[in-house]
Amino acid sequence: MSALVVAENVSRTFVRGASPVHALRGVSLELNAGELVALVGRSGSGKTTLLNIVGGLDRPDEGEVIIDGRKLNQLSEAARQRLRREQVGFVFQSFGLLPFLSVRENVGVPLRMLRWRTRAREARVTELLATVGLSDHAEHRPPELSGGQQQRVAIARALAPSPHLLLADEPTGQLDSETGQQVIALLQRLVHDSGSAALVATHDPALVSFADRVLYLRDGALVGDPSA
């Protein structure tokens, strides 16, 4: 099987004061279509930095990332932005919804940015809201929803343009245990059904059971299972 996403020897260093901070140290990984991979590590281990680089939001100091055969370091900034909008979906711990827009409008935001025609956009949004179980909440605004419902909206929005890659950074961090497991189970089902690849960063070991594979990150480097 040819990997959908490849990261090769990725390193990233930040300078804070007079001291360099090695956020990532020679990280290599592959993500396959239809696969949900958990990225497990403590706060500060480099999870968010790795997601930002894999998603094209940041550039590595060394190494490269390849998405669907395209090397990100060879793309212009405009091409990288286009790739992010069309092929990468992001889900964040804080949901990132626009409070003054309805649920329907929030899910449709990335499709408006890609200039989808109105009829196609509305059909896609309706389909996604049914998929995540929020058809009855289409005209609600985010503040009227529970945390779990808001994260379902965020997942629907991330999947709106049918991206090849889904990146989720602590998507259950603001949810209670039961709701978090429901959200991850939904994410798992959607990834398997859509054929996208997903990389989910978490510090919660309880979510590992929903992953097809688990990667452990410690001090910016991938390591074996620390509990083994």
Protein language model features and the residues they cover:
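H-loop (His-switch) and adjacent beta-strand-loop-beta switch element
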Residues: 214-226
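ABC family nucleotide-binding domain
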Residues: 4-210, 214-217
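Short amphipathic beta-strand/extended segments with alternating polar/hydrophobic composition
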Residues: 74, 225-228
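Short, low-complexity, intrinsically disordered N-terminal peptides in bacterial proteins
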Residues: 1-2, 228
